[in-house]
Amino acid sequence: MYVQRKCLFLLAVFTISSVSGNNNDVKDGADRGAHSDRGGLWFGPRLGKRSLRIATEDNRQAFFKLLEAADALKYYYDQLPYEMQADEPETRVTKKVIFTPKLGRSIAYEDKSFENVEFTPRLGRRLADDMPATPADQEIYRQDPEQIDSRTKYFSPRLGRTMNFSPRLGRELSYDMLPNKIRVARSTNKTRST
C-alpha cells in the first residue's frame, strides 16, 4: 500500500511539473489548436477544429477602420458636383415621321357606310340584330318565331341545327309540377344538409 501511494505521488508530481513547465499563459491571439506548445495535454472539442473567436480588440479596430473609410468615401462623394454625374440624355424628336396609309385605303374610309352587298351567312348562323343587312337578306334568312329559342343566346347550336337544343337530358320537365317545399332527409351519420 505504501508503494502504491509513493508511485501515485510521483506520477502526480511529474504531471504537475510537466504542465507547469509548459507556458500556460496563453494569450487570446495565440494558437490554441492541436499544434500548440502544450502538445498532447490539450483537451479541445476536436483536433484541428478552429473555434470562432468573438470580436476581440483587433477585430474592433478593423471594423472601426472600415467605418472610417466608408464615412470618408461618402464625404468625398457628396463633394462631387452634380453635373459630373451621369444623367439620362434628353429624348428629342429629330425626325418628323409621316405616316402613310396602307394601299387601297383612304383617310375618309371610316366615314363610308356599308353598301348593299349580297351577303351569304355561314351555315347555322343567325344574323345579329344590329348588323346591317339588305331587306332581301332579312326576308330570306329570318326564321320562324317558333324555331327561335331563348337558349340560343347562351348555347350556340352546331352548324345547320334548327331544333330545340336541351343541354342535359331530362330538362324538358315542367317545374310547375314539382312541389314548392322540398323534403330534406337526414342521413344516418347525423350530418345536416342545408
Curated annotation (Swiss-Prot):
Membrane-spanning parts: none
Which UniProt keywords are present, listed alphabetically?
Amidation, Cleavage on pair of basic residues, Hormone, Neuropeptide, Secreted, Signal
Q: Which family does it belong to?
A: Belongs to the pyrokinin family.
> Which function does this protein serve?
A hormone that controls sex pheromone production in females and pheromone responsiveness in male.
A GO molecular function term, named singly, is: neuropeptide hormone activity
> Where is the protein found, in the record's own terms?
Secreted
Q: In which tissues is it expressed?
A: Expressed in the subesophageal ganglion.
Q: In which broad location class does this protein mainly occur, judging by the first location in its UniProt entry?
A: secreted
**Which species is the source of this protein?**
Heliothis peltigera (Bordered straw moth)
In this entry the propeptide is located at 51-94, 172-194
What protein name applies here? PBAN-type neuropeptides
Q: Name any one Pfam family assigned in the record.
A: PBAN
Look up the signal peptide feature and give its range.
1-21
One of the record's GO cellular component terms = extracellular region
Residues with the Leucine amide modification: L47, L103, L123, L159, L169
GO BP terms: namely: neuropeptide signaling pathway; pheromone biosynthetic process
